[in-house]
């Protein structure tokens, strides 16, 4: 049995969201093939994602000097605890599915906040004399990024979403990365149905291989 973490970052309801529609098709087909797997859901807009703020930095600084949690403020303990819980959940996961829209050539800020909570020294990567090393390497972990763009950006220098997420996953040691992207539906609305059908088919293929 594998643990799946299905991470969404979208304010729209599913029926109005292209990426969530494709993600739902993937989930349906994947669940049919792997009914024994456990799927956990994380909605980055509705679940509390703790940003790294002054309390977090101050608390981490105290812990690095050898201080115990008893010497941290209530806010520092609460915030660092939430970040630790998210990082532990990430480490314990076998397969990750990110579902995002493109916003201004990237993705919503909530996803960057989440990435900052799971890229943790000593948990997902470490530093060596030769550079940073991902601690999740060699564990067979996989990542799928389902993404939507109104224009045509995939593979261009303007795309700061899919390549960035792929780079971050590799940084932590997750080398098996694939993506399903629907794009151009706003640029060429008369072909929107065609583009969506293609992405849905790709999501079904991804479910068979994931």
From Swiss-Prot:
- EC number assigned by the record: 1.6.5.-, 1.7.1.17
Q: Which residues does the annotation say bind FMN?
A: 17-19, 102-105, 148-151
Q: Which reaction does it catalyse?
A: 2 a quinone + NADH + H(+) = 2 a 1,4-benzosemiquinone + NAD(+); N,N-dimethyl-1,4-phenylenediamine + anthranilate + 2 NAD(+) = 2-(4-dimethylaminophenyl)diazenylbenzoate + 2 NADH + 2 H(+)
Going by the UniProt record, its keywords in alphabetical order are: Flavoprotein, FMN, NAD, Oxidoreductase
Q: Which cofactor does it need?
A: FMN
Database matches in Gene3D superfamilies: 3.40.50.360
Cofactor binding description: Binds 1 FMN per subunit.
Q: Which Gene Ontology molecular function entries are recorded, alphabetically?
A: electron transfer activity; FMN binding; oxidoreductase activity, acting on NAD(P)H as acceptor; oxidoreductase activity, acting on NAD(P)H, quinone or similar compound as acceptor
Q: Which HAMAP family match?
A: Azoreductase_type1 (MF_01216)
Record's function text: Quinone reductase that provides resistance to thiol-specific stress caused by electrophilic quinones.
Complexes and interactors = Homodimer.
Q: Which family does it belong to?
A: Belongs to the azoreductase type 1 family.
Q: What is this protein called?
A: FMN-dependent NADH:quinone oxidoreductase
Q: What is the lineage of its organism?
A: Bacteria, Pseudomonadati, Thermodesulfobacteriota, Desulfuromonadia, Geobacterales
- Which gene codes for it? azoR
